[in-house]
Amino acid sequence: MRKELEHFTIDGSLGGQQEWFPEYWMKIGGCGAVTACDICIYLARYLKMPEACPFDAWNISKEDYLSFGEKMRPYLSPRPTGIDRTEIYVEGFGRYLADSGVSGIGFREISGTEDVETAVREVRAQIDRGLPVAYLMLMHRDKALDDYMWHWFLLNGYDETEERFLVKVVSYGEGKWMDLRHLWRTCRRRKGGFVLLETEKQIEPNGLQTGYVPHGE
């Protein structure tokens, strides 16, 4: 079974990109702010929370997105060590939502020290609810994942069979299917984790696509 959440595009880019920002620190360390902006656009579109996004969430331009990123920056400011703990992300993102007049959204943190099957269950349940997942990965033994180390990205879908549980990783303007169990088993001492949104609001039906699609099609 494959389930994917809708995600906006800007000039062919799936979601925003930190590389768009002219300022050095946002360009190299703006991943936390970018994931928060993407989530806010989703909230405005599918949870009827227009206060979450200061622009028209259905017609957002690259210029709008850059302005939005600068608005988010004081709350999730890039720093030399990065936003390297989920509690930093929750505190900053929570302040942004409160200052913007958004209510009815809470957060729950899942530590990277949890076992892998807990991670699978939590991601599956969150996507089934129609909500994206903010994921922090620090170090990983697999050097092929270098671009995703010390990095925040979104999960907005899963593709599950008896053999594997793939997640759709949204970052750098594209979506890639990756094995969640492999991502989670970093074999490194410091762990990241992910942040789940909690709300009792009804997600709009077009926020979620469901159905079985063989992986790769």
Locations of the language-model features?
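Active-site-adjacent structural segments surrounding the nucleophilic cysteine of cysteine proteases
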Residues: 1-87, 216-217
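Solvent-exposed loop/turn segments at secondary-structure junctions
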Residues: 38, 139-142, 173-175
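Non-transmembrane alpha-helical segments in soluble domains
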Residues: 40, 94-97, 124
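C-terminal domain-closing interface element
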Residues: 78-103
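Catalytic cysteine-centered active-site loop
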Residues: 102-114
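Active-site-adjacent substructure of cysteine-protease-like catalytic cores
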Residues: 112-169
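Noncatalytic regulatory segments and standalone regulatory/sensor domains
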Residues: 146, 158-217
